[in-house]
Amino acid sequence: MADPSAFYEPEEDELLSQLAIPVQNYQPLSEGDEYRRLQQLEQHAYAQQTAMAQEQEMEQLAVLELIPEDVKRFLVMFHQAILENDLPTITSMYESGWNKLTQAHYLNNEWPEAELIAPLVGNDQVFLTLYRELYFRHVYARLQPTIDDRFQSYENICELFNYLLNSEGPVPLDLPIQWLWDMLDEFVYQFTSFSHWRSSPKAKTEEELEMLAESPNIWSSYSVLNVLYSLVQKSQINEQLKAERAGKSVEEVTEVAGEYGSKPLYKNLGYFSLICLLHVHVLLGDPTLALQTMENVDLGNAAFLTRITACHVTTYYHVGCAYMALGRWPDAIKTFVSVLIFFIRMKQYHTRSYQYGSIAKTCERMYALLAICTTLSPGPSDENIMTIVKEHYGDQLAILQRGGPEALEAFKDLYLQACPKYLNVNPPPYEDASALEAWLANPPADATQRHLELFLSDVQAVQGVNGMRNLLKLYTSIDAAKLAAFSVSGEEEGEEEVLQQLMVLKSASSTYGRGQAETTLLDGERKVTNNLDFTIDGTMVHVEETTSHRRYAGFFIRNAEHAQRALTSIKSAPLPVRKPASSSAPAPATTAAPISKSGESAAPAPAEAPAAPEKKAGTWVPKSRQARIAA
């Protein structure tokens, strides 16, 4: 006889036990009766499951009817384009179609959940995972995410990256670079948002505290860094960039890239992961490691990252912040000025972009940081950019340059306004109630406040010698005793203090900066960051200003060469040929010569020369052209 246990799974025991009806005075049944009884219970259970599934399907169809028709058509076409790897259509629907439908239907509410639209796309799990990524990005951008949204977005993005990284081979998926950048940038943004939200236990409900205690690894810095480094390693992007910089052929670079890195999807994900690693390491307070991750990335005007304006601006902002954390003010100034010039030139092309608002905010923060850097390291800079800085932060800039306690407060306000929102590496210990109480009793200092204290200590060291620098500007040489009389009271003790301040000024006036031939972002040499230099010979201080004036020679040389080329082109151009008179035109009537009194015909009077064309005022004709016209 067949084994009854072979017709149902062990996990159905609980369901069958719930469906079983207790019978009074239960008598043992024979094997046949027991088998028939189990069959009836099994059929009843499956019938109940089928009814529940049909009921859920009916509810799903009813909800699906509430979705606008244009949204359903968009999702079906979007799914079809992704299946066919139709990159132009995917790009258009992602950058334009999605945002238009959001503005029309879901400006202040959520898009339909992935389970509701699953019948429209044949329950394609890859597409549904990509759809959830857009869904949660919309929730973070437009709405207030709940703790369930935060957890589910993390699980969804991990599912997507596991699919990309752990498949047996490269996945047959092709997405536009704008989507890939937005995906990784949103990944880092949601990580920072969750970290800031998690760092305040007092505002949490009991349910939220319990969920955080059960899931300590959700959005942990280790898991985020693990994903980014895995994408970098899978794509072999560092090896590819090194090969391209060495001038190797396309075939050699493809061989270096390997099976995964040769695919555009993995190569672009690896490239953008390097920039996201820069972002994360800056937020975690490790500027040196942040710049090391970018050692193979080109930051020139023709770099790959310049194809996406948001990526370009984000990269330069965090590189500049890393330089500021290392005290390399000239490098930070060059970085900020470079990307701000680019943004001004490209601004007209991005005013209608859906990312224009965030890009403009980042640029505004860079103007504030530029005001700080140019105060701490005065020197020549782009005049147009500095004009904008003075327009936006003119009052603060005057206070910064004047010095004093007000300047320190202005430095603090500008820094907090424009600096990155740094993260605490270790979250509160939610899994241990006693440790959490101790943490609440003595919470650690905020990461941004710690960076602010370090920054202000550097500012105070520089601001303390600003008065000495202003005095030195008035002299070419001055005795230390005389300088002490102007700066401090008590000539004997003041002279010693003056020498100490001069040494501090000398130290504060130099930093480590990149040279012309440097290749990586960390390479550099010692540079003077001040436009004032001095030497001490005994008790005499010899001062020399090193202000570099604007060079006009190159401007005149370029324009002279341009004028010479224009003149040569004019000389070599052929003269215009006047068209001959048409044969069909009537011949001019000839007037008979007048008869003189002697009967001889008089010679015809000479025709008047045609009047010279009137020269237009303000026109200039080269002399060589005039000579040829006269000839």
Swiss-Prot record:
Organism expressing this protein natively: Cryptococcus neoformans var. neoformans serotype D (strain JEC21 / ATCC MYA-565)
Chain ranges of the PCI domain: 335-526
Assembly and interaction partners: Component of the eukaryotic translation initiation factor 3 (eIF-3) complex.
Segments of skewed composition (Low complexity): 580-612
GO molecular function annotations of the record: translation initiation factor activity
Keyword Protein biosynthesis tagged: yes
HAMAP family reported for this sequence: eIF3l
Listed name of the protein: Eukaryotic translation initiation factor 3 subunit L
Function, in words: Component of the eukaryotic translation initiation factor 3 (eIF-3) complex, which is involved in protein synthesis of a specialized repertoire of mRNAs and, together with other initiation factors, stimulates binding of mRNA and methionyl-tRNAi to the 40S ribosome. The eIF-3 complex specifically targets and initiates translation of a subset of mRNAs involved in cell proliferation.
Family: Belongs to the eIF-3 subunit L family.
Keywords: Cytoplasm, Initiation factor, Protein biosynthesis
Pfam families, sorted: Paf67
One CC-aspect GO term: eukaryotic 43S preinitiation complex
Subcellular location: Cytoplasm
Region (Disordered): 571-631
Keyword Ribosomal protein set for record: no
Alphabetical GO biological process terms: formation of cytoplasmic translation initiation complex; translational initiation
